[in-house]
Amino acid sequence: MTEHTYYREPFVRTPEELLDKKLELAQITKDDLIIDLGCGDGYVMIAACQRYGCRAIGYEIDSEIVEMATKAVEESGLSDRIEIRQKDFSEHDFSEGTVYLLYLTRNELNKFSLPLEIHAPKRTRIVTHDFDMPAWEPKETVEFPLMSGDTKFIYLFEK
């Protein structure tokens, strides 16, 4: 038996008021496959699939959060379009997916910068907020004021 060691990022939900702008920036179509690394409760994928008719795969390591996401997907009626994988997302095949919707720390994004550059298909879009992708030049940066008075930055990268 092999023992896997992974680093757990805290589950912090993408602010709802930011979600619309992230989805708009990603230019999602019905033909896209969304990848959400550290998908949490699945609400970002659910919103994308409801609005655009696309498919999605989410990775989450925490079994309790996987249960929460799986239940939310079932309740949304999108089980045929959204798959939740209980797996360390560092094991993801980066040739899979056309849009990556990410809310990860800069340290985590740094780990995926090179695999995305090497393996992601051409024209893959990556949308992050709060943290940019190290070694990637954003195609677009949006400054987004929240109702709380805070300002968030959303980044669009394209391969």
Model regions and ranges:
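A short SAM/SAH-binding and catalytic strip from SAM-dependent methyltransferases
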Residues: 98-111
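C-terminal substrate-binding/active-site "lid" region of AdoMet-derived donor-dependent transferases
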Residues: 108-159
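Short beta-strand element of Class I
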Residues: 54-59
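S-adenosyl-L-methionine
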Residues: 1-31, 67-96
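Conserved class I S-adenosyl-L-methionine
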Residues: 31-40
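Conserved SAM-binding loop of SAM-dependent methyltransferases across substrates and taxa
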Residues: 43-52
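Conserved SAM/SAH-binding beta-strand->alpha-helix loop
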Residues: 62
